């Protein structure tokens, strides 16, 4: 959510956060506080995908999360029941194709794949992403888990994938030490700010100067490096540098 709300938008452009975690989404009951029940979201694309209508149905499932109703920062809510993931087998590939070409509609997309979505059937979304991000705490427990997940990601995605780390502070290990140990770039370091984070995860009341707080400032700063990574990859592949597709590989 922090990236969605801070991503820089050119005139006429929009950004989508797609919750594609096979273990279920968190935005509807969390940030949106259950205000939309389960009327929109990923589950509704299963039937559309089987009928060859996913390209049209996708846009109807997006939810505006801006206060002004500008519809330039949108969410595709995830599954409310993980059991529904089994019906999405053919949908992942169709979504990947849609996201790959989404720039023609002046949209960028951030894909949240949760803890295990970057492997298995939904991994095609990570394979097609410009940048894959793994979120981890800078504690020993967090980094041990990250090391195992990074190895699995690299096996799944191959050597050409751009994999970066997002660190959540709270442990003793520094950025440089983590980069050396895990052999991955730390793209962003987010401060441990539970009160500010609760606004994004649970729809809590915003504290004073939330937009200028440490958490949102750190998220905003990270977008600069992310856009550089996207441009570098696209230059290497001979693609336009604007916009991008990002996937979160783990949380």
Language-model features and meaning:
Residues 1-3, 92, 147:
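Short amphipathic alpha-helical segment that frequently serves as the phosphate-/nucleotide-binding helix
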Residues 32-37, 152-153, 205-208:
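Short, hinge-like loop/turn segments at secondary-structure boundaries
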Residues 155, 159-251:
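C-terminal lobe/tail of nucleotide-utilizing enzymes
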Residues 8, 91-94, 141-145, 211-218:
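Helical mechanochemical/support elements of P-loop NTPase systems and associated helical scaffolds
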Residues 41-44, 119, 139, 213, ...:
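Serine-centered coil/turn micro-motif
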Residues 1-18:
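A conserved segment at the C-terminal end of the G1
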Residues 94-99, 103-191, 198:
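Conserved catalytic-core segment of NTP-binding enzymes
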Residues 17-101, 196-201:
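P-loop/Walker-type NTP enzyme "switch/lid" segment
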């Amino acid at each position: 959510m922090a990236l969605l709300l801070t991503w820089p938008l050119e005139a006429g452009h929009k950004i989508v956060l797609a919750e594609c975690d096979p273990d279920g989404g968190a935005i509807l009951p969390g940030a949106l506080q259950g205000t939309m029940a389960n009327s929109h979201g990923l589950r509704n694309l299963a039937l559309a995908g089987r009928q060859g209508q996913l390209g049209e149905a996708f846009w109807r499932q997006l939810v505006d999360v801006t206060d002004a109703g500008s519809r330039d920062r949108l969410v595709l809510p995830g599954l409310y029941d993980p059991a529904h993931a089994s019906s999405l087998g053919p949908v992942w590939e169709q979504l990947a194709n849609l996201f790959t070409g989404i720039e023609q509609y002046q949209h960028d997309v951030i894909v949240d794949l949760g803890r295990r979505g970057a492997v298995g059937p939904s991994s095609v979304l990570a394979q097609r992403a410009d940048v894959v991000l793994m979120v981890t705490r800078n504690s020993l427990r967090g980094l041990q888990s990250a090391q195992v997940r990074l190895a699995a990601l690299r096996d799944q995605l191959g050597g050409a994938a751009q994999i970066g780390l997002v660190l959540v502070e709270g442990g003793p290990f520094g950025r440089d030490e983590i980069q050396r140990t895990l052999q991955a770039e730390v793209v962003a370091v987010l401060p441990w700010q539970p009160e500010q984070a609760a606004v994004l995860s649970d729809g809590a009341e915003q504290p004073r100067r939330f937009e200028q707080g440490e958490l949102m400032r750190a998220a905003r700063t990270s977008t600069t490096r992310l856009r550089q990574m996207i441009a570098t990859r696209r230059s290497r592949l001979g693609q336009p540098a604007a916009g991008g597709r990002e996937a979160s590989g783990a949380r």
